[in-house]
Amino acid sequence: MPHIDFDTIPGSIRVPGQYIEFNTRNAVQGLPQNPQKVLMVAPMLTAGIQPALEPVQLFSDAEAADLFGQGSLAHLMVRQAFANNPYLDLTVIGIADHSAGVQATATVTLSGTATAPGVVEITIGGKQVSTAVNTGETAATVADRLKTAITAADVTVTASGSGAAVTLTAKHKGEIGNENGLTVSTGNTGLTYQANAFTGGAKNADIATALSKVAGKHYHIICSPFSDDANAKALSNHITNVSNAIEQRGCIGVLGMSASLSTATTATGKINDGRITCAWYKGAVEPNGIIAAGYAAVLAFEEDPAKPLNTLEIKGLAVTPDAQWPLFAECNNALYNGLTPLTVVNNRVQIMRAVSTYTKSANNTDDPALLDITTIRTLDYVRRSVKERIALRFPRDKLSDRLLPKVKSEILDVLIKLDQAVSTHSRLKAAGI
């Protein structure tokens, strides 16, 4: 047997000649790149041409409108994601509404006669829809025009009704319809209004089947618009299964919430997963899915798994009223309960500190081991770096006593390079570079 192992030159050749092969197993000396692939699970409309439960890679929100329906939550989540990261590697899998689901509804009733020209504006889920008002127009006339404008807009509701009443119905069934904020402004037109918030939505779609369809592919970030207990549990179970020591396709899940601190921390306490992070934007008018989509896109843009995400802006979210801004005690409590606060700084919505929902060990002991979401992302990257180095260096080597020191050497080299990457960053930061 030859002392040098060849992959393509048999050792039994007796014909004289010069036989040369290339071996690139030792070519890679550095650490692997860390591009982030994002999977978005989102509700679609029947008008969409993409079959439900079939993932598709997207590059613009215009594609999402065609594939999943204009004004669907999938469409608007894709728009929000690309607004925060135009270079996003995004795959979307659309899901149909639950067969037992109920659509949320809201009403806006105008009254009076316009005494001056102006604009009536309605904001639905953070999207503004407006119509001009002329002097002398009745409330019913303006309401009809407003319904037409809403129907034509990229919003997650439809408009109907008679007379001066406008009935808004969520396009998607489930509790997600209740998350649409609703505000109305009649300006100085002389018209008045009465508005009732979205209520009645029940039974969100189930993401478990959609996740099972993509279980064999590696996505680094999975974004879900549903923050209800059942779907959060399904997301947690899926991520645990694909990220374990056998499958080794490490990923994190991203959720969003706009509820009160008490409601949000109760939800994260039930999740308690070091691989799931939930952005909390108190009092937001956007649905939770829009918050999650922007947060996931910002996470994906930061390829350094250990770099903190503090102060990064999430675009596309309306600035909440001052009364909704959380106090220091609320933010601190949120961070102690697995909730990532989003705060308004200089008229921009920013991440305060990105944490996971994990706070308690299996025996209910306080455990900050996976506090920051960067911790599990870093561990995933270290595992992948070691695994890829071994796979590159020793793809078909026989397990022997001579091989083990080589494997150890390669692993140590990877770990040293990882440490050097952190040390170099620290030295540059200390030098003000």
Go through the PLM ranges and name each one:
Residues M1-D89, E303-I433:
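Structured, hydrophobic secondary-structure cores that serve as assembly/anchoring elements
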Residues R145, A149-A153, H238, V242, ...:
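Conserved short hydrophobic interaction patches
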Residues A140-A143, K147, A208-L211, S236, ...:
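Extracytoplasmic/secreted envelope proteins and their assembly/folding machinery
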Residues G112-I124, S185-A205, V214, E313-N337:
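Bacterial flagellar/type III secretion structural subunits and associated motility module proteins
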Residues Q80-H98, G161, K171-L309:
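Extracellular Cys-Trp
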Residues G101-A114, D206-L211:
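Disulfide-bonded cysteine-rich modules in secreted/extracellular proteins
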Residues V129-E137, P225, R396-S400:
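Second-shell loop/turn segments in exported
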Residues S60-D66, S111-G181:
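Extended, beta-strand-rich, solvent-exposed assembly scaffolds of outer structural proteins
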